[in-house]
């Protein structure tokens, strides 16, 4: 039998280097040069000099971790969370909140220059968030620590699968302030709860939910004990077995209201909603203002979810067609249209990664295109849609790289980037949300 030689991977030498940081990338990492390659440096800011250790050395770039700041930026601040240096949830607490937005905007501009060949962007004022307690949903991990011989409830460590035990998360909604200690105590006191793999948190306007995912059956007696502790915190419990379905029909449907827009959105606990409630409302108002619909437009809203944009725009448009690949979200969008007495919006379930030429909504007489894709972007639909039929395209992005890439396609189809603005949906993280408005030349 022939043996195939496989070279042993050499361990990386722990080099300590002095690096001069010249810029920040779109993940919130400092950028330096080392050995004629770009080096991405965590916990480093532009115009700083740091001592760092190389943690990955690739063919075209390297990665490093700062362990000492030799010359600090004027915008460097002390992190406000006790877990910041271990937890992987936030990446930018060491940077002043206002400057975070500035650096993110610079990073997006560079991506547009690189991928879309656009070097002058008409930046609008960013949509800002409060600095703390902005998350209305989160996912917590639960894992057994062999060394400590106990279960931990917390977040994943930065760059690791291990769990950081958390006392309190200052970016999480205050209604869940005690969730870590309450469940840490419960799970460690009752061995039957060691089958809990994670907790999902979701805050509605009137109810706060904790979904408990478990891999083995849990007795009703234990469930009652957990329910009692949850009731003291005003949390609604939902138990989820290995099945992916989150069954909560026995509880009132969660919802969020957009009072300024006069809308109410119900959602299932397995549906996607925006994490930051205040920025979501500001984002929808901005979309309404930027599009400035006059009442005779036909709007196509792709990746529409539960109707977040569709129903807002339906109030000003002639018709809105929403398309979404998740059936439960389409059902909620249809229900939300009915709840809000909106009759000019219809919703279709369709996998937008597939060919769309046979879809019932394809090639309609449409004026406005709204895109709100996942991080993979909208390239699949942009390459298939007859874009020239649209007068306006509104693109809402959660990944600036795919936005810049897709903007090149939109520009080549005869559109001009009219406006662009950041939405600081996730302060203190490397995540960048952007809204861009394109108009046909």
From Swiss-Prot:
Q: What is one Pfam family matched by this protein?
A: tRNA_U5-meth_tr
Q: SUPFAM superfamilies, alphabetically?
A: Nucleic acid-binding proteins, S-adenosyl-L-methionine-dependent methyltransferases
Q: Name one GO molecular function term.
A: rRNA (uridine-C5-)-methyltransferase activity
Binding annotation for S-adenosyl-L-methionine = 274, 303, 308, 324, 351, 372
Q: Where is the active site?
A: 398
Q: Which InterPro entries match?
A: 23S_rRNA_MeTrfase_RlmD (IPR001566), MeTrfase_TrmA_AS (IPR030390), MeTrfase_TrmA_CS (IPR030391), NA-bd_OB-fold (IPR012340), SAM-dependent_MTases_sf (IPR029063), TRAM_dom (IPR002792), U5_MeTrfase_fam (IPR010280)
- Indicate the segments forming the TRAM domain, all copies: 10-68
Entry EC no(s):
2.1.1.190
Which Gene3D superfamilies does the record associate with it? 2.40.50.1070, Nucleic acid-binding proteins, Vaccinia Virus protein VP39
Which amino acids does the record list as binding [4Fe-4S] cluster? Answer: 81, 87, 90, 169
Name the catalysed reactions: uridine(1939) in 23S rRNA + S-adenosyl-L-methionine = 5-methyluridine(1939) in 23S rRNA + S-adenosyl-L-homocysteine + H(+)
Its family remark reads: Belongs to the class I-like SAM-binding methyltransferase superfamily. RNA M5U methyltransferase family. RlmD subfamily.
Function description: Catalyzes the formation of 5-methyl-uridine at position 1939 (m5U1939) in 23S rRNA.
Name listed for the protein in its UniProt record: 23S rRNA (uracil(1939)-C(5))-methyltransferase RlmD
**Organism, scientific name:** Pseudoalteromonas translucida (strain TAC 125)
């Amino acid at each position: 039998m022939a043996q195939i030689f496989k070279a042993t991977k050499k361990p990386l030498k722990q080099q300590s280097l002095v690096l001069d940081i010249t810029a920040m990338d779109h993940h919130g990492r400092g950028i330096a040069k080392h050995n004629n390659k770009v080096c991405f440096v965590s916990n480093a800011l532009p115009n700083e000099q740091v001592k760092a250790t190389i943690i990955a050395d690739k063919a075209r770039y390297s990665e490093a971790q700062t362990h000492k700041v030799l010359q600090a930026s004027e915008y460097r601040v002390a992190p406000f969370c006790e877990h910041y240096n271990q937890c992987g949830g936030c990446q930018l607490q060491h940077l002043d909140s206002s400057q975070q937005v500035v650096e993110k905007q610079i990073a997006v501009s560079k991506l547009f220059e690189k991928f879309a060949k656009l070097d002058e962007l008409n930046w609008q004022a960013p949509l800002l968030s409060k600095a703390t307690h902005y998350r209305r949903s989160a996912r917590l991990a639960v894992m057994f620590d062999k060394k400590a011989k106990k279960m931990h409830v917390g977040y994943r460590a930065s760059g690791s699968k291990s769990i950081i035990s958390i006392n309190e998360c200052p970016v999480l909604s205050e209604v869940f302030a005690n969730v870590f200690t309450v469940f840490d105590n419960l799970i460690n006191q009752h061995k039957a709860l060691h089958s809990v793999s994670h907790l999902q948190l979701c805050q509605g306007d009137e109810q706060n939910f904790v979904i408990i995912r478990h891999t083995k059956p849990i007795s009703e007696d234990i469930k009652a004990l957990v329910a009692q502790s949850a009731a003291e915190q005003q949390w609604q419990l939902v138990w989820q077995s290995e099945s992916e379905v989150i069954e909560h029909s026995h509880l009132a449907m969660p919802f969020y209201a957009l009072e300024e827009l006069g809308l109410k959105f119900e959602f299932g606990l397995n549906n996607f909603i925006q994490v930051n409630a205040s920025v979501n409302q500001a984002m929808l108002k901005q979309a309404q203002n930027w599009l400035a619909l006059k009442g005779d437009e036909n709007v196509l809203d792709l990746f529409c979810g539960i109707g977040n944009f569709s129903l807002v725009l339906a109030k000003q448009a002639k018709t809105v067609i929403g398309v979404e690949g998740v059936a439960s979200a389409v059902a909620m969008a249809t229900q939300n249209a009915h709840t809000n007495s909106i009759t000019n919006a219809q919703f279709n379930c369709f996998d937008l990664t597939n060919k769309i030429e046979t879809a019932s909504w394809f090639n309609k007489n449409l004026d406005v295109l709204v895109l709100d894709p996942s991080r993979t972007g909208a390239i699949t639909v942009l390459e298939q849609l007859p874009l020239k039929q649209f007068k306006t395209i509104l693109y809402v992005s959660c990944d600036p790289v795919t936005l810049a890439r897709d903007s090149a396609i939109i520009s080549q189809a005869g559109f001009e980037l009219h406006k662009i603005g950041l939405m600081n949906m996730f302060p203190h993280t490397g995540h960048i949300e952007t809204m861009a408005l394109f108009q046909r030349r």
